[in-house]
Amino acid sequence: MKAPGSRLQVSATGRAIIALLFVFSVGPILSALPFELAGELDAAGLRQTLARQKGRVVLLNFWATWCVPCREEFPELSKLQGKYGAAGFQLIGVSTDFAKVRPAVQKFLAEQRPSFPNYRKKSGGDDQDFIEAVDSSWGGELPFSVLYDRSGKKVRVYSGSLPLAAAEKEIRKLLAAR
C-alpha cells in the first residue's frame, strides 16, 4: 500500500509496527497522567480547594493505602463521580499516607484509575488546624468522608466505610436542590 502523496510503500507489517510503537511509547504516558496526585494539602490548601468547588456538591474522602476499607470502597467512589459528575458533583480524595510511601500511593492510583482528583495530606504542620478544617469530631479514623452542599456548607460526616446507598441518596437530594 502506498502512503498518500508518497512513493513510499507501507506493508501490513510496517503498519503493525508503527501502531505498536505508538501504543508502547505514547499510550502509557497518556494513561498515567490523570492518575498522579494533584498535590499536597495543609489546612489552608484544603480550605482553598473546597472554596473553589462552590456551586458543586462535594464529597471529601480521606483514605490511606494501608486501610483495607478505604481500598475496598475506592472503586465505588470512582463510580459515584462518574455517575454524578456531569450533574455538579465533585469527589475529592485525600491520602493520609506519609510522604515516604508516596510511591505506594502513586501505584495504588495507577491501579485504581480514579475519575476524581486525589491529594496527599501535607506532612508536618499543625495537625489540629487540619482536623478543624475537616471536622472537629474527626479522630483520625479511616475512611472518613464529609459531604458538602453547593454553598459549601457541611451536610454530613461519615466515619468509617461510606454507606453507599444512603450517601448516594443524599447526593441526589443535594444535586436536585438549586
What does each of the following model-derived ranges do?
Residues 2-14:
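Short, basic, low-complexity termini and linkers enriched in Ser/Thr/Gly/Pro
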Residues 112-114, 122-170:
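Thiol/disulfide oxidoreductase modules built on the thioredoxin-like
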Residues 28-34:
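Sec/Tat signal peptide C-region and signal peptidase I cleavage site
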Residues 74-113, 125-132:
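Structural microenvironment flanking redox-active thiols in thiol-disulfide oxidoreductases
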Residues 37-58, 81:
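A short beta-strand-turn-helix
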Residues 62-79:
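Conserved redox-active cysteine motifs that mediate thiol-disulfide chemistry
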Residues 56-58, 62-66, 98, 141:
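Short pre-active-site segment immediately N-terminal to redox-active cysteine/selenocysteine motifs
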